[in-house]
């Protein structure tokens, strides 16, 4: 079933592919209006969000290097804008499913993520994960030595400069879980 899906999206047998999972507010926002969370606001998670438009160049470069890119997720704010046939907005496809989420996470060459629940799937299958704009930095989970972690920039507004890694930890910003 999984191989048939890849074929349906135009991936030849044995093609290299990357799972892209860029967090935005859409996933949590869908819980606003249900009976379990009648007045719950998830805005305190907004500092963790990424903008998919800022990742298009990375996707294009990976496609140029021979990879297919599959954008993962359950619900997203906006589509991935690329006309490259190797860049697939799987999250917005009619054939997105939980089974395929697991299959893709297990079979990908690696994953690029801003830290979402999906990361656990490639992690369980020991796939390398490149974390981008990761925060909170002090709560980092590193699956193995093949993973890469790029922290979100932390800016000192008073001095108008980026904090060093040491300053992030010394100021306790590394463990902040709210904007």
Kindly give the residue locations of the regions a language model identified.
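Leloir-type glycosyltransferase catalytic cores
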Residues: 1-8, 145-179
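Secretory-pathway luminal glycosyltransferase catalytic domains
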Residues: 1-43, 178-179
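Charge-rich alpha-helical segments
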Residues: 2-6, 43-53, 67, 129-131, ...
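Surface-exposed alpha-helical segments enriched in charged/polar residues
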Residues: 7, 56-60, 103-106
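Catalytic donor nucleotide-activated moiety binding site of glycosyltransferases and closely related
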Residues: 15-29, 50-97
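Short, glycine/acidic-rich beta->alpha junctions
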Residues: 47-54, 93-97, 103, 111-117
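A donor-sugar binding/catalytic signature common to diverse glycosyltransferases
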Residues: 101-147
């Amino acid at each position: 079933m999984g191989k048939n899906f890849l074929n349906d999206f135009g991936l030849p047998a044995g093609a290299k592919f990357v799972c892209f999972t860029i967090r935005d507010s859409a996933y949590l926002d869908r819980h606003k209006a249900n009976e379990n969370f009648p007045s719950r606001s998830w805005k305190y998670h907004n500092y963790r969000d990424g903008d998919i438009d800022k990742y298009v160049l990375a996707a294009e470069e990976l496609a140029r290097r021979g990879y297919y890119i599959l954008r993962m997720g359950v619900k997203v704010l906006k589509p991935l804008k690329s006309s490259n046939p190797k860049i697939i907005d799987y999250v917005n496809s009619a054939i997105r499913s939980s089974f395929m989420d697991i299959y893709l996470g297990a079979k990908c060459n690696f994953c690029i993520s801003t830290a979402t629940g999906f990361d656990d799937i490639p992690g369980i299958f020991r796939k390398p994960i490149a974390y981008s704009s990761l925060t909170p930095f002090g709560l980092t989970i590193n699956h193995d030595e093949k993973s890469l972690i790029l922290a979100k920039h932390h800016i000192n507004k008073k001095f108008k400069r980026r904090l060093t890694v040491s300053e992030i930890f010394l100021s306790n910003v590394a463990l902040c879980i709210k904007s």
